[in-house]
């Protein structure tokens, strides 16, 4: 029977909103989704959420490079990410963004509570500054040699080789990632979270069973080396949330990123009109369960900073962190040059989602081991397991049931003992899914598939079908095979959602965990259609080649507004102050006889009229649409004599030219003549 229903909140680490989802990301999202789908099958109330991590200097700089706003970039990236996850059947209840009202409010709330409770400290620090770019350098924009293990080319916040965390000022021979310049030291006041105050609590939490043994052991090393106060602020320019009452200071991305779990759940509750669940799940004494699926590279933040922040601000801590390893391809780190750095969208252009879901699941355990995607083994395993063992079991029997018995299965089981063997396995398989011992669960299921196919081989329905007077035997044998297929697909339903839907359509029944205790007897199935196709190595070759081509395309010269029209040389504020920009109302707009480029605009500056010629005719072939609209003009530009008359200023527009010219307009409420500052 189904266990007592639990309330569970599950999250995946938030993908960073400056790049595409790749197969490394997909390991975590598939692992979490399989676990979530199993929990739902067992009747538990699961909320499965995620969001884009949308703040930080990398996003700010990439948006500048693309010539768009950070807001536009993260919006477009969020749509891409959500499309990729949907393509892999990741069953999120909500996918949000850390750049949201919910996240801002919660970040400010947690910060304020930490400050009121004495856990925020202020002090002036010496910080690395890029003298060429005129900006303080975030941790990830400084590279150098790790001060702990001496590994070269490591980022300024943590070492990817030994896992150590440190200040960027501790790096040996640091360099700016932005310009390549050697950074200089500059003083700046920063805000620190007093992590050492939570050392005792964190050590107790570590021993509580909330962490895998490997993670707990690693944390013990960090405790022994001593916890340090954590710098949670960054200086402008920065894309993120400004710290309350601290102009020019912003929350470090790693402060508001995990709060994004809360923000996404709050957004989900608001969408549902649910005013109670947020507090119910996040209050300090909550009996709901909270699980974070994360990669081993971000354990430090999730096992130390995050629970301490929650404790210090009066919220509950995670029930458990489920940490996984990295993905390698063909035994090596994913490589763009070898075509093994594969984007999720590229995969879906060549293979279905179920194939990768199955392969990853078959290799996953509860340990923090790396997973190797061996592409040749992938083809062999998918064909051997899904096609030959599982789908073939249905196809070998369905034809006889459909053609000879009009789709109606036998009234009794041909081999009740064998069926009991299959249903008795539900306990062990369920425990394996629950414990994230996915590989073990798959091995158990495939062992049953072997038993089922052995039964069909021994009973040989294709022989029985030719023997007179054995119709009842044929119906019983094939019905038995289909019933065993149903049990196998029920066990595999968390892994193979698309194949499961097709199986349900054929079986004419929903696959539920408890229903397998009752076999399908005298049940009518639908006409069998091919459930799954074999995959070929030529598809792998095409996938790898496509990935190489994408890398070449990405390496092509950057195009876009900034590339076409680079930013001009720096000017002083005094230079800028000489330009008098004013709001102007377009009273009239008309063609200029003798010119195919110009429009004559009559502008009202709040009592003063101006005549301006503007080369925007191609963009506005009907000048009447401009009448009554407000724009911005340079009001103190010296009058220019033209053969059509005198132009008394210049209106502001953006775009490369021709039809792609866009007249600038102020927000509603601006009045003609007001100065633009």
From Swiss-Prot:
Annotated cofactor note: Binds 1 zinc ion per subunit.
Keyword Phosphoprotein: no
UniProt organism field: Enterobacter sp. (strain 638)
First-listed, main subcellular location of the protein, grouped into a coarse class: cytoplasm
Keywords in alphabetical order: Aminoacyl-tRNA synthetase, ATP-binding, Cytoplasm, Ligase, Metal-binding, Nucleotide-binding, Protein biosynthesis, RNA-binding, tRNA-binding, Zinc
Function: Is required not only for elongation of protein synthesis but also for the initiation of all mRNA translation through initiator tRNA(fMet) aminoacylation.
Residues covered by the tRNA-binding domain: 575-677
GO cellular component terms, A-Z: cytosol
Compartments (UniProt record): Cytoplasm
Motif, 'HIGH' region: chain positions: 15-25
Complex formation: Homodimer.
E.C. no: 6.1.1.10
Protein name per UniProt: Methionine--tRNA ligase
Family the entry assigns: Belongs to the class-I aminoacyl-tRNA synthetase family. MetG type 1 subfamily.
Binding site for Zn(2+): 146, 149, 159, 162
Highest taxon of source: Bacteria
S-S bridge residues: none
């Amino acid at each position: 029977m189904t266990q007592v229903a639990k309330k569970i909140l599950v999250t995946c680490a938030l993908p960073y909103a400056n790049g595409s989802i790749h197969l490394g990301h997909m390991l975590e999202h598939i692992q979490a989704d399989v676990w979530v789908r199993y929990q739902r099958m067992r009747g538990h109330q699961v909320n499965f959420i995620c969001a884009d991590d949308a703040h930080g200097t990398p996003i700010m700089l990439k948006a500048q490079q693309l010539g768009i706003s950070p807001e536009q970039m993260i919006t477009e990236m969020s749509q891409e990410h959500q499309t990729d996850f949907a393509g892999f059947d990741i069953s999120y209840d909500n996918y949000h963004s850390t750049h949201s009202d919910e996240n801002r409010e919660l970040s400010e709330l947690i910060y304020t509570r930490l400050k009121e409770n004495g856990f925020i400290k202020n002090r002036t620090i010496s910080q690395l500054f890029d003298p060429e770019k005129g900006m303080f350098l975030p941790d990830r924009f400084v590279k150098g040699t790790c001060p702990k293990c001496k590994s070269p080319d490591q980022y300024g916040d943590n070492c990817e080789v030994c896992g150590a965390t440190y200040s960027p000022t501790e790096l040996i021979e640091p360099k700016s990632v932005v310009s390549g310049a050697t950074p200089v030291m500059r003083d700046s006041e920063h805000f620190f979270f007093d992590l050492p105050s939570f050392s005792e609590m964190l050590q107790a939490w570590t021993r509580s069973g909330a962490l895998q043994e490997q993670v707990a052991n690693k944390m013990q090393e960090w405790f022994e080396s001593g916890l340090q106060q954590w710098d949670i602020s960054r200086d402008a320019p920065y894309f993120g949330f400004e710290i309350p009452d601290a102009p020019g200071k912003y929350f470090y991305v790693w402060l508001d990123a995990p709060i994004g779990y809360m923000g996404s759940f709050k957004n989900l509750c608001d969408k549902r009109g649910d005013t109670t669940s947020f507090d119910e799940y996040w209050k300090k004494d909550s009996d709901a369960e909270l699980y974070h699926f994360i990669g081993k590279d971000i354990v430090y933040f999730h096992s130390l900073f995050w629970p301490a922040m929650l404790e210090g601000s009066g919220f509950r801590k995670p029930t458990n962190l489920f940490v996984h390893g990295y993905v390698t391809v063909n035994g090596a780190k994913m490589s763009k040059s070898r075509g093994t750095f594969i984007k999720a969208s590229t995969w879906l252009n060549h293979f279905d989602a179920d194939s990768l879901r199955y392969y990853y699941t078959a290799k996953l355990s509860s340990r923090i081991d790396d997973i190797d995607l061996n592409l040749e083994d992938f083809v062999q395993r998918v064909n051997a397991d899904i096609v030959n063992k599982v789908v073939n079991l249905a196809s070998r029997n369905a034809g006889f049931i459909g053609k000879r018995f009009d789709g109606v299965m036998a009234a009794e089981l041909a081999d009740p003992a064998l069926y009991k063997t299959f249903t008795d396995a539900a306990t062990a398989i369920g425990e394996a899914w629950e414990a994230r011992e996915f590989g073990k669960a798959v091995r158990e299921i495939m062992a049953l598939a072997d038993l089922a196919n052995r039964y069909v081989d021994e009973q040989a329905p294709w022989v029985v079908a030719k023997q007179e007077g054995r119709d009842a035997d044929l119906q019983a044998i094939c019905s038995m095979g289909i019933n065993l297929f149903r049990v196998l697909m029920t066990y595999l339903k968390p892994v193979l959602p698309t194949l499961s839907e097709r199986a349900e359509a054929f079986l004419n029944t929903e696959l539920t965990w408890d229903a397998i205790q009752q076999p399908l007897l005298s049940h009518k199935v639908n006409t069998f259609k091919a459930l799954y196709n074999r995959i070929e190595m030529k598809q792998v070759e095409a996938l790898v080649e496509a990935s190489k081509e994408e890398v070449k395309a990405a390496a092509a010269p950057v195009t876009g507004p900034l590339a076409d029209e680079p930013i001009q040389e720096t000017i002083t504020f005094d230079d800028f102050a000489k330009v008098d920009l004013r709001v102007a109302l377009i009273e009239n707009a008309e063609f200029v006889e003798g010119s195919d480029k110009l429009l004559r605009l009559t502008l009202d500056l709040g009592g003063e009229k101006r005549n301006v010629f503007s080369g925007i005719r191609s963009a506005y072939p009907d000048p009447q649409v401009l009448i009554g609209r407000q724009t911005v003009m340079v009001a103190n530009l010296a009058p220019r004599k033209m053969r059509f008359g005198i132009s008394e200023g210049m209106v502001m527009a953006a775009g490369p030219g021709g039809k792609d010219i866009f007249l600038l307009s102020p927000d509603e409420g601006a009045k003609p003549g007001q100065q633009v500052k």
